[in-house]
Amino acid sequence: MTLSGQSSIKQRPLVIGLVAGETSGDILGAGLIRALKQMHPNIRFVGVAGPLMQAEGCEAWYEMEELAVMGIVEVLERLPRLLKIRKDLTQRFTQLKPDVFVGIDAPDFNITLEGRLKQKGLKTIHYVSPSVWAWRQKRVF
């Protein structure tokens, strides 16, 4: 023990697993990475990331664009690849055992992944930006 009460044994840096599947998630994820790096400079981020998250230091196992699908036809065309990615991520995160997994928005992909990781004993968080549904002017006020 040191005088500050901290153990002098070297601890591994925090490891955070992240998955963002769209541009809005990349923006949120980059901000999260920046904020956490201020508190923990040696923190490590791994997972599925876009260019902004990668610029902040996230190691991308897959590019965010691989998850960005819209419409039933595109989803069906890419479903085998999406399922393979989710299976691979489940295995990789389970093996790595990050301190926490953060699914950033993209609920169609992340909610199932988060459930599987929880079953494996990992801590998970689903991180989304608040949204306002104001389709009519009177809902804004």
From Swiss-Prot:
Pfam families: LpxB. It comes from the Bacteria. SUPFAM superfamilies: UDP-Glycosyltransferase/glycogen phosphorylase. GO terms for biological process: lipid A biosynthetic process. InterPro entries: Glyco_trans_19 (IPR003835). Its EC number is 2.4.1.182. Keywords: Glycosyltransferase, Lipid A biosynthesis, Lipid biosynthesis, Lipid metabolism, Transferase. One of its GO terms (cellular component) is membrane. It catalyses: 2-N,3-O-bis[(3R)-3-hydroxytetradecanoyl]-alpha-D-glucosaminyl 1-phosphate + UDP-2-N,3-O-bis[(3R)-3-hydroxytetradecanoyl]-alpha-D-glucosamine = lipid A disaccharide (E. coli) + UDP + H(+); a lipid X + a UDP-2-N,3-O-bis[(3R)-3-hydroxyacyl]-alpha-D-glucosamine = a lipid A disaccharide + UDP + H(+). GO terms for molecular function: lipid-A-disaccharide synthase activity; phospholipid binding. Pathway: Glycolipid biosynthesis; lipid IV(A) biosynthesis; lipid IV(A) from (3R)-3-hydroxytetradecanoyl-[acyl-carrier-protein] and UDP-N-acetyl-alpha-D-glucosamine: step 5/6. Belongs to the LpxB family. PANTHER family: LIPID-A-DISACCHARIDE SYNTHASE, LIPID-A-DISACCHARIDE SYNTHASE, MITOCHONDRIAL-RELATED. Condensation of UDP-2,3-diacylglucosamine and 2,3-diacylglucosamine-1-phosphate to form lipid A disaccharide, a precursor of lipid A, a phosphorylated glycolipid that anchors the lipopolysaccharide to the outer membrane of the cell. This is Lipid-A-disaccharide synthase.
